[in-house]
Amino acid sequence: MAAPTGKLLVHRIRAGLTCLTQVRWSRYSPQYLDPETDKQVYSRPLEELSEQERTERELKIVRPIKAAPSNVTSSVFSDPTISKFTNMMMKGGNKNLSRSIMNQTLEQIKRTQLEKYYKAPEEERASIECNPYTIFHQALHNCQPIIGLTSILRGGKSYQVPTPLKENRRRFLAMKWLITECRDNKHRRTLMYEKLSQALLDAYQMQGEVVKKKHELHKMAEANRAFAHFRWW
């Protein structure tokens, strides 16, 4: 009996594997639970937990847990928003440099605010924020636009239609504007962390070019409000 040709052999192999289901990029079966890295969740007593939370804690005793991602930690300095900003600032895969710039930026903000704190009179010190993480989050919130513009084609003509932005899109635009402003409009002798720390402090006080860019986008959306009915496509 002659040996089967290549195509016939492949057909027989595929016919014998029809009962198998291909699972791509899957390390864990559905019975594995997601890991919980927040220490405060485990420190709460059972009396304060709801019925659902108590059931979930009992399930974690008997069911296997997935391994935590390498970028997730239970450290008090872990911040998902800052990690996202660090990844967006990264160029060429050099995350160590991006992380170093972010740490230097937070340190520079801390030094600037402490200097301002000690120079201020005693009655004004309570109003000066010295936590760089609080300043970063508030500055990012001040840079987030509420409404954006979407290009809609109607009758062969393109219209810029104002549309509300989702939370992820707002955060992305704020981060992108901050990074672009610090890269494109800084002096060649000014370091990246110096420019970024100053941009964050300006945005914290509702000042700076990034906040102006947000207001300009809102003005353009207000000018194109006549095309808002095109949003229901």
UniProtKB/Swiss-Prot annotation:
- Gene behind the chain: mrps7
Q: Which GO terms of the molecular function aspect are on file?
A: mRNA binding; rRNA binding; structural constituent of ribosome
The question of whether Flavoprotein is a record keyword is answered with no
Q: Give a Gene Ontology cellular component term annotated to this protein.
A: ribosome
Against Pfam families, the record matches this protein to:
Ribosomal_S7
Q: Subunit comment for this entry?
A: Component of the mitochondrial ribosome small subunit (28S) which comprises a 12S rRNA and about 30 distinct proteins.
Official protein name in the record: Small ribosomal subunit protein uS7m
Q: Which chain regions cross the lipid bilayer? A: none
- List UniProt keywords, sorted A-Z: Mitochondrion, Ribonucleoprotein, Ribosomal protein, Transit peptide
Per UniProt, the transit peptide runs over 1-28
Family membership noted in the UniProt record: Belongs to the universal ribosomal protein uS7 family.
User: GO biological process: what's one of them?
Assistant: ribosomal small subunit assembly
Q: Which organism is it from?
A: Xenopus laevis (African clawed frog)
